């Protein structure tokens, strides 16, 4: 785990440095980024070995880069339509030597060759219903979704928009402070 911690620390330093000149994300200090890293790590107990994962709207690398660092046996596709953010992600992958991470600089609806994923992650990307609709061609009954979301109130409102005959879900509190953060774990119930 020591090597993983070194990579996370290197990522943190690079992200802070790159953000100063390129304004990648709305984080100005190490403490805020460390909370983002902790939140990203909170999905690890739900990740199994050798999964094919896509992180929607990877932005500054949360949770995608952190997932790639902490789960080297998984293949992680980082989907990011913004060219500036994609460049940062590609540069980070090279600097950290992450052979298991790949950047897709497109919108999901523009990329049909990615296939089916075992796990779909997203953080601050879109509504739950929109994520499920966008990934219909990239998921099957075995696909799990781990969506990093805010308050249970907001999540409940979003989940009221999905067809509960087709999906089962669980809301898991990450206990991240100072803001309430939760993981929404979702699976299809049928094809």
Where are these regions (language model features)?
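Conserved SAM/SAH-binding loop
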Residues: 104-110, 125-126
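Conserved SAM-binding loop of SAM-dependent methyltransferases across substrates and taxa
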Residues: 60-73
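Class I SAM-dependent transferase core
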Residues: 1-49, 54, 84-101
């Amino acid at each position: 785990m020591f090597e993983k911690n070194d990579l996370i620390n290197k990522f943190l330093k690079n992200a802070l440095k790159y953000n100063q000149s390129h304004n990648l994300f709305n984080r100005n200090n190490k403490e805020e980024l460390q909370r983002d890293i902790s939140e990203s790590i909170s999905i690890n107990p739900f990740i199994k070995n050798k999964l094919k994962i896509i992180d929607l709207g990877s932005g500054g690398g949360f949770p995608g880069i952190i997932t790639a660092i902490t789960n080297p046996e998984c293949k992680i596709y980082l989907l990011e339509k913004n060219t500036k953010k994609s460049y940062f992600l590609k540069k980070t992958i090279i600097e950290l030597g992450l052979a298991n991470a790949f950047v897709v600089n497109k919108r999901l609806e523009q990329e049909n060759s990615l296939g089916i994923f075992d796990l779909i992650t997203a953080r601050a990307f879109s509504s739950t219903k929109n994520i499920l609709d966008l990934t219909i061609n990239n998921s099957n009954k075995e696909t799990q979704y781990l969506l990093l979301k805010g308050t249970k109130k907001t999540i409940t409102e979003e989940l009221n928009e999905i067809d509960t005959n087709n999906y089962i879900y669980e809301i898991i509190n990450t206990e991240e402070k100072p803001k309430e953060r939760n993981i929404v774990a979702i699976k299809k119930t049928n094809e």
